[in-house]
Amino acid sequence: MKAIVNVDREWGIGKDGHLLVHIPADMKMFRTETTGKIVIYGRKTLETFPGAKPLKNRVNIILSRNPSYTVEVAYVVHDPEELMKLIETEFPEYGREDVCVIGGDSIYRLLLPYCSAAVVTRTEASFDADAWFPNLDEDPAWTCVVVGETQEFERIRFHFDRYERVG
């Protein structure tokens, strides 16, 4: 399982339920990394999608604490154990790299212990955030194995990095 996230300098990921910055190259990378794969996210993240509808061309699994919560054309689970069982029984053909955790902050914190990799768009700017991703640079369980080439969009510098769990 891998996390896919866009963070600012302080590992901020969002404000008022929205991304901090929209970078076309980041959106393209996200589509490339997730199309045809399993994406896992929370209800609040779903509500930020166009029409509050699950992403097309992916297996959508939504984590919610609400036992009566349902979503058309998506699976809903209520805890990591139920999630793992669903993936093992319904989607055995998918490998670990085909399962993507895409947010929001509480889902990242809940599922990061299950992830072996993280694809991180590092934005070289600071924004006013109210949601954060754990700082992998300060976590000894993680190491950065790829620092991507610095790119720029509308005077915002960014790069695509890859972290892997140590051991």
Predicted features, each with a name:
Residues 1-167:
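Enzymes that bind and transform nitrogen-containing heteroaromatic metabolites
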